Amino acid sequence: MMSSDRGESPAEVVLGFLEEAEPWRLRSAQFPSKVGGKPAWLSLRGLPCLPELECDRCRLPMAFLLQVYAPISGQDWSFHRSLLLFCCKTPECYTLNDSSCMKVFRSQLPRRNEFYPYDPPPEEEPLSDPESDQRVLPVSGVKLCWVCGCPGNKGCSRCHTVTYCGKNHQMLHWKHTHKKECGSQEVSLVTTSVFLFPETELVTEPEEEEDDGKEEDTKKDEGEEEGSTTKTDEDCLSLAETLAETDLEEMAMCETKDMKVFQRFKKRIAPEPHQVVRYSRGGSPLWVSSQHIPSDQDIPQCTCGAERTFEFQVVTAQ
């Protein structure tokens, strides 16, 4: 669980790591943080519709990447709270400094709600699993897409046993398995779709703070980098005759600044190189490059008019 207590220091960072887990531990009733598989929807009503889950560039359905369970203490309406990240699987949609192929959805519930018990879930595997049939959500009865686990009301016209979010996923399922199974009594209730990312649990632990010695080493390293840069500038004076002076200065400044940011990123993640999520509600991102860092004006306000704040970042490619 990612803690979202506003009383904590904004600088505190919680790291997320991948870990294998039993499938039942990644169900909605366990309030999981996880990567891949189908979404473990928190609220079982009011789910995003198909247009909201499409890539804004190619208009194809996006795939579920990960979700973070991050309740906010002290607020009953967000006693349960999950953030779900979806991404497009079309490589051509990923262009520099453009987030239109990724979307985040927030879902939250009070402690007393119609879907889950008031008390925390037990640590043992339940005797019965109401989520074992992944075609429909329990309680609400919302039908789900067989391929991606998102809301889907488009049924197979032949067997009427499976539903899809749209024609794209219906064709995908037909091509890979349903063509052989349609109308058969052997149609399985659970399937691993080729559309999904591998499913693993996202376990967390606080990031250890750097001690004074490490900070001094960092400053020393940065000083050495600056010294090296100065020496490099001296060595490259002979090239200044063939390159325009302004171009040379711009290149040097850009490369030096970008290298410092990248070195700072590498130093920060070096103690835990397998981290995949950095959570720090109200904190700051750990930038990998000095280029294309958004300004306050670049970050749109919430629909309520409030300023948006940083909450978490994904630091490795899945």
Label the predicted regions.
Residues 1-318:
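Preference for intrinsically disordered or flexible, low-complexity segments
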